[in-house]
């Protein structure tokens, strides 16, 4: 929001289009700009939000709504793509098709991407490749700097006693095979053992977000958690939009304490009060891992940190959020698949191997 306001005030007469992929992000980005700059000449183009503004100097749009309507949008000077790691590396997807047409309308158009994960699964950096959209990283900031400066909430990842055994799970297209993960987690005994740890750690936590391997898994976990008096709901890709909106509002307002989901609340979902993440979804995708972590790093009143219960071994696999190495770079340099980390023998907090003192309990190594 501040970037757009500064741009428009420094160079009046520019037209800016901010693109993203879900209506929740469109609304969040628009609302934040209007809070920062109430007189902003901003509109929204999104079928999901029932708005199709085209005459404003600043337009917040969904790619699904505009990818075939470039001529309606007209001349744009700057396109900002939020969550730009979702732009495909090659081919004519919605983003690439739209950008190609917009470039015909204005050959001097510029494109800026915003993301917490400037790389894709198994394809390295967003600025690599002959057909890349982005040529340079203009600004990069370390996660720990943002935490130390008070812009993000710290994560406290914990190793679990009932961490999933993935030794028999195969890989397809760079990640664990979905059907095998479903079979692994479709186990009542395992679910009950996991539940014991979730309840023990969650007693002092107010807002839980749980990532599951599939729809059945998400619904099962919600059911057994609710049996213990925890207000719980589930969101999946099949949840009707009006039901989804109601559930999210109840979760954000604290009327629902626990929300389980399957691959729908990983990118751009903004619920600052979340103070416990539960990873029941193992992944080899570092991008997905970082996005899941990001759901707990928003600041909120009376929130000191966000606990991460990692049953999928993701933190050990990819490294703590402040000690990551992109998978593409790891392979290119021949480095180990798992960045170095260590686990506190006292409180089970996972941290960078370079740490000499546990950031949670103070144990010295």
State where each predicted segment sits.
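Conserved Walker A/P-loop ATP-binding site and its immediately adjacent core
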Residues: 2-3, 7-35, 215
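Conserved helicase ATPase core of P-loop NTP-dependent helicases/translocases
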Residues: 27, 43-54, 219-223, 230-262, ...
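Inter-Walker segment of RecA-like/P-loop motor cores
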Residues: 34-71
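Conserved RecA-like ASCE ATPase "motif II neighborhood" in helicase/translocase motors
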Residues: 58-83, 88-98, 261-262
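Conserved RecA-like P-loop NTPase helicase motor core
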Residues: 64-70, 85, 237-325
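Post-DEXD/H (motif II) to motif III coupling segment of the RecA-like Helicase ATP-binding lobe
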Residues: 88-157
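Conserved interdomain linker/interface between the two RecA-like ATPase lobes of SF2 helicase motors
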Residues: 135-212
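A conserved SF2-helicase RecA2
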Residues: 139, 143-153, 300-353, 364-365
């Amino acid at each position: 929001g501040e970037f757009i306001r500064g741009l428009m005030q420094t160079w009046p007469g520019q037209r800016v289009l901010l693109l993203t992929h879900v209506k929740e992000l469109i609304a969040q980005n628009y609302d934040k700009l209007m809070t920062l700059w109430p007189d902003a000449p901003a509109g929204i183009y999104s079928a999901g939000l029932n708005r199709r503004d085209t005459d404003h100097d600043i337009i917040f749009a969904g790619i699904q709504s505009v990818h075939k309507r470039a001529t309606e949008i007209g001349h744009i000077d700057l396109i900002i793509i939020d969550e730009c790691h979702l732009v495909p590396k090659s081919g004519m997807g919605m983003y690439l098709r739209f950008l190609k047409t917009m470039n015909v309308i204005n050959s001097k158009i510029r494109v800026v991407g915003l993301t917490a994960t400037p790389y894709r699964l198994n394809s390295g950096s967003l600025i690599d490749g002959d057909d890349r959209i982005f040529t340079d990283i203009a600004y990069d900031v370390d996660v720990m700097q943002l935490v130390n400066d008070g812009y993000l909430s710290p994560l406290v990842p914990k190793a679990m006693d009932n961490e999933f055994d993935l030794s028999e799970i195969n890989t397809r297209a760079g990640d664990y095979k979905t059907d095998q993960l479903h079979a692994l987690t479709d186990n009542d005994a395992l679910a009950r053992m996991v539940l014991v740890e979730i309840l023990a750690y969650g007693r002092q936590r107010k807002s839980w977000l749980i990532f599951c391997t599939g729809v059945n898994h998400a619904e099962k976990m919600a059911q057994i958690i609710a049996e213990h008096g925890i207000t719980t709901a589930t969101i999946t890709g099949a949840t009707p939009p009006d039901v989804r909106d109601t559930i999210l509002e109840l979760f954000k307002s604290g009327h629902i304490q626990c929300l389980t989901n399957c691959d729908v609340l990983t990118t751009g979902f903004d619920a600052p009060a979340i103070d416990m993440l539960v990873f029941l979804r193992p992944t080899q995708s570092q991008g997905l891992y970082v996005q899941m972590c990001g759901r707990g790093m928003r600041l909120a009143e009376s929130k000191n940190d966000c606990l991460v219960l990692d049953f999928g071994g993701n933190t050990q696999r990819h490294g703590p959020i402040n000690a990551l190495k992109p998978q593409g770079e790891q392979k290119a340099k021949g480095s180990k698949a798992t960045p170095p980390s260590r686990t506190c023998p006292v409180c089970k907090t996972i941290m960078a191997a370079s740490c000499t003192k546990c950031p949670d309990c103070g144990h010295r190594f």
